[in-house]
């Protein structure tokens, strides 16, 4: 099996073209993801990205976490996929429609004057704010600055969906955020029947925040694109920031804009190819 290792701000993925047999016909990708994402016994990665044909968009993808679970969306991963298909001529246009479990997502390739790819801007769609859309247990309506009992502690959270569930917790010092202690508890909290990603956020300025993430199915990662988008939406709803914000993650910055005129969220950031290889299955 040929693969390409890529990353978006250190959130790293193994990308595989499975558009033709025999890879197209395989039904054990979840097991393969666990094996090859292992950083000691496999290639190593936060997830496995698979490319398939689509009758609804230019291409269809599957993304599998390192534990074999399948999230609805992944912002950093979709940027990597966009660069992968563009540079290989699989999709011969800059604006690429991708069929995902969260609907049709549209990344757009950004190039310099010489035509080299410098980044990807992704139309991430509209945020989903109602509890049943996240999903989150509780009375219908948005979940903004709500109390959540986690063990013996009570924390204030803001929850929403960017195609996948996110729970934001605001902190005074991002370096002291309890990512690895509180994060896994909130991920599996009964309030979130599909589990949730957990973002810890420090507001720096109206146009700047810092964020750390505990990803559902992957644990702590260097970056989370949908999490950065959710962070900006939640911060606007709380009155903490403007609609155009730079989100600083452990792996680097993402530029997020929640446009008022169409209610859609746009994410701009890098996608980098690290190496290529071949692995027997």
Curated annotation (Swiss-Prot):
InterPro entries: DAP_epimerase_AS, DAP_epimerase_DapF. GO terms for biological process: lysine biosynthetic process via diaminopimelate. The keyword Amino-acid biosynthesis applies. The active site is at residues 74, 224. The record marks 166, 215 as: Could be important to modulate the pK values of the two catalytic cysteine residues. Its EC number is 5.1.1.7. GO terms for molecular function: diaminopimelate epimerase activity. Keywords: Amino-acid biosynthesis, Cytoplasm, Isomerase, Lysine biosynthesis. It comes from the Bacteria. Pathway: Amino-acid biosynthesis; L-lysine biosynthesis via DAP pathway; DL-2,6-diaminopimelate from LL-2,6-diaminopimelate: step 1/1. One of its GO terms (cellular component) is cytosol. Its main location: cytoplasm. Substrate binds at residues 11, 65, 75-76, 164, 197, 215-216, 225-226. It is an enzyme of class 5 (isomerase). Gene3D superfamilies: Diaminopimelate Epimerase, Chain A, domain 1 (3.10.310.10). It is found in: Cytoplasm. It holds the Pfam family DAP_epimerase. SUPFAM superfamilies: Diaminopimelate epimerase-like. The keyword Nucleus does not apply. It catalyses: (2S,6S)-2,6-diaminopimelate = meso-2,6-diaminopimelate. Belongs to the diaminopimelate epimerase family. Catalyzes the stereoinversion of LL-2,6-diaminopimelate (L,L-DAP) to meso-diaminopimelate (meso-DAP), a precursor of L-lysine and an essential component of the bacterial peptidoglycan. Homodimer. This is Diaminopimelate epimerase. The gene is dapF.
